[in-house]
Amino acid sequence: MKLLFFTALVLVVISLIEVEAENERACIPLEKECTKTPGNCCSGLKCDCYRRFEQGVAKGIQCWCIEKDVTYKGV
């Protein structure tokens, strides 16, 4: 009975470690595009979106993972 309990506990711990590792791999790093998956930026980052214009014509929206609490201004 103790062996069965111990085996089940080990399997649960291994499963949790694998899930956590998978979640870490799935995040999008700093300054990478997050247009299709805005909620997947790594921790400490947010997905910030901008409307892109070419010669005054809107060409769609692009989003990038940037640092939280950082504001960028045009030059």
From Swiss-Prot:
InterPro entries registered for this protein in UniProt: Spider_toxin_CSTX_knottin
MF GO annotations: toxin activity
Coiled coil location: none
Signal peptide: 1-21
Propeptide: 22-25
One Pfam family here: Toxin_35
GO cellular component: extracellular region
Compartment annotation: Secreted
Distribution of this protein across tissues and organs: Expressed by the venom gland.
Keyword Nucleus: no
Principal location class: secreted
Post-translational modification: Contains 4 disulfide bonds.
Keyword tags: Disulfide bond, Secreted, Signal, Toxin
Recorded family membership: Belongs to the neurotoxin 19 (CSTX) family. 06 (U6-Lctx) subfamily.
Protein name: U6-lycotoxin-Ls1d
